[in-house]
Swiss-Prot record:
Mg(2+) 1 binds at E10, D56. NCBIfam families: 5S_RNA_mat_M5. Keywords: Cytoplasm, Endonuclease, Hydrolase, Magnesium, Metal-binding, Nuclease, Ribosome biogenesis, RNA-binding, rRNA processing, rRNA-binding. Mg(2+) 2 binds at D56, D58. This is Ribonuclease M5. Binds two Mg(2+) per subunit. Disulfide bonds: none annotated. It is an enzyme of class 3 (hydrolase). The keyword Ribonucleoprotein does not apply. PANTHER family: RIBONUCLEASE M5. Signal peptide: none annotated.
Length: 178
């Protein structure tokens, strides 16, 4: 499988793993403190062929993803589930994911809207047990996996659902299939 867009990953091990899964070009951020030079490379890549962000499903990976989204408009996102990116010792990273899971993530990329509209209200997430309650975390994980938006806490979930244009009906449908 060939990917035309540049794939942004965190480091060399991620690049090696992704290139074993698909034919592509990558850009490495080399950590969560992305400098202006790296952002400029990503901007140029976005203008020429497009960019897909595929970072580790952890806090530093989310920080990188957020920084890129804030500074480079129109990037696409691919997410690998946390459980699928864990090694036997519990370390999380794209470099630990199965090749098939990397391909799967890259076949289901999503693009946030530049102008996020709020079609979902926080009260809906509370009503559906996604923010408050003993089972909220598990329900968020299920929803995030089904909608392919990456691991999220309650606040991040609301922001992602609105950024990707999901409706209340989409959320209810995904949870019904639980």
């Amino acid at each position: 499988m060939k990917i035309n867009e540049f794939i942004v990953v965190e480091g060399r091990d991620d690049t090696e793993r992704v290139k074993r899964a698909v034919e592509c070009d990558t850009i490495e951020t080399n950590g969560s403190a992305i400098n202006e030079q790296t952002l400029e490379v990503i901007r140029n890549a976005q203008q020429s062929r497009g960019v897909i962000v595929l970072t580790d499903p952890d806090f530093p990976g989310d920080k990188i993803r957020s920084t890129i989204t804030e500074h480079v408009k129109g990037v696409k996102h691919a997410y690998i589930d946390r459980e699928k990116a864990k090694n036997k010792k519990g370390k999380i990273g794209v470099e630990h994911a199965d090749l098939i899971d990397i391909k799967e993530a890259l076949m289901h990329v999503s693009s946030p809207f530049d102008e996020a509209y709020e079609s979902i209200d926080k009260s809906v997430l509370i009503e559906l047990g996604l923010i408050v309650g003993k089972d909220a975390r598990r329900r968020r994980e299920i929803l995030s996996r089904k909608l392919r938006i990456g691991h999220s806490n309650g606040k991040q979930l609301l922001k992602k659902l609105n950024a990707f244009g999901y409706t209340e009906a989409d959320v209810r449908q995904a949870l019904e299939d639980e």
